[in-house]
UniProtKB/Swiss-Prot annotation:
Endoglucanase (EG) that cleaves the internal beta-1,4-glucosidic bonds in cellulose. Signal peptide: none annotated. The active site is at E6. This is Endoglucanase gh5. Activity is stimulated by zinc ions, potassium ions and DTT. Activity is inhibited by manganese and chloride ions. The lineage of its organism: Eukaryota, Fungi, Dikarya, Basidiomycota, Agaricomycotina. It comes from the Eukaryota. One of its GO terms (biological process) is cellulose catabolic process. GO terms for molecular function: cellulase activity. Belongs to the glycosyl hydrolase 5 (cellulase A) family. Optimum pH is 4.8. Active from pH 4 to 5. Activity is significantly reduced at pH 6 and is not observed at pH 7. It catalyses: Endohydrolysis of (1->4)-beta-D-glucosidic linkages in cellulose, lichenin and cereal beta-D-glucans.
Length: 27
């Protein structure tokens, strides 16, 4: 979860794309 929170500080577009990959990795 800490990684996801840090990702929120990035750009919106990049954040969403990175978040999607991160969530997929978590699952």
């Amino acid at each position: 979860q800490a990684v996801l929170s840090e990702t929120g500080g990035g750009d919106t577009a990049s954040c969403d794309e990175y978040l999607y990959q991160e969530l997929a990795y978590v699952k």
